[in-house]
Curated annotation (Swiss-Prot):
Biological source species: Halalkalibacterium halodurans (strain ATCC BAA-125 / DSM 18197 / FERM 7344 / JCM 9153 / C-125)
Enzyme class: hydrolase
Keyword Hydrolase part of the UniProt annotation: yes
InterPro entries linked: 2H_phosphoesterase_YjcG-like, Cyclic_Pdiesterase, YjcG
Protein name: Putative phosphoesterase BH1439
Length: 171
């Protein structure tokens, strides 16, 4: 089964992202707006308890942190994807790095660019038109992230939360 690790932003930020995703993201119905921390990976059922334990340890080792969205950007020419760019933060980078150490495999395909996808698989014209329009808008949002989620993929391709992990030491 496929698993992944992500963080889900607050409802106001999800609503803002979804206002674009419903038009520009074919994965809109498969998963809510999120920041991918660990791309999909396969696990056998017997491996799950040790992975859950490791994600819990990682989460406990990172304190809650600010998530700041500050502009719209694209991965063009690598892919025709539109996203809300998230300002880098050491805790966010630490989560990503820790989720790419043993027992997890390293992501060799892309470097980590914190973002929230709002459109993908767009034609060049769609990308250009929307990027130009969205860059004129002031996109500014900040919130505190205090949890991450381990997700699993259902047979229909959608993703659902397996377990939520609070960040930082429990009091």
């Amino acid at each position: 089964m496929n698993y992944g690790v992500a963080l889900f932003p607050s409802k106001p930020l999800q609503d803002l992202a979804n206002s674009y995703r419903m038009r520009y993201d074919p994965h809109y119905t498969l998963i809510p707006p999120h920041v991918t921390l660990k791309e999909p990976f396969e696990l056998e059922e017997q491996e799950l308890p040790s992975v859950v334990k490791r994600v819990r340890e990682i989460a406990k080792g990172v304190d809650p942190f600010p998530l700041e969205v500050y502009k719209v950007d694209t991965f063009y020419p690598v892919s025709n994807t539109l996203f809300f760019k998230i300002r880098e933060h050491s805790a966010l980078t630490e989560l990503y790095e820790q989720l790419h150490t043993s027992p997890f495999k390293r992501n060799e395909k892309y470097s980590f660019v914190p973002h929230l996808t709002i459109g993908q698989n767009l034609s060049y014209d769609e990308l250009s038109d929307n990027l130009g329009r969205l860059k004129m808008k002031q996109i500014q949002h900040e919130e505190i992230v205090d949890r991450i989620q381990l997700l699993y993929q259902l047979d229909n391709g959608s993703w659902t939360v397996y377990e939520t992990f609070k960040l930082g030491k429990e009091e």
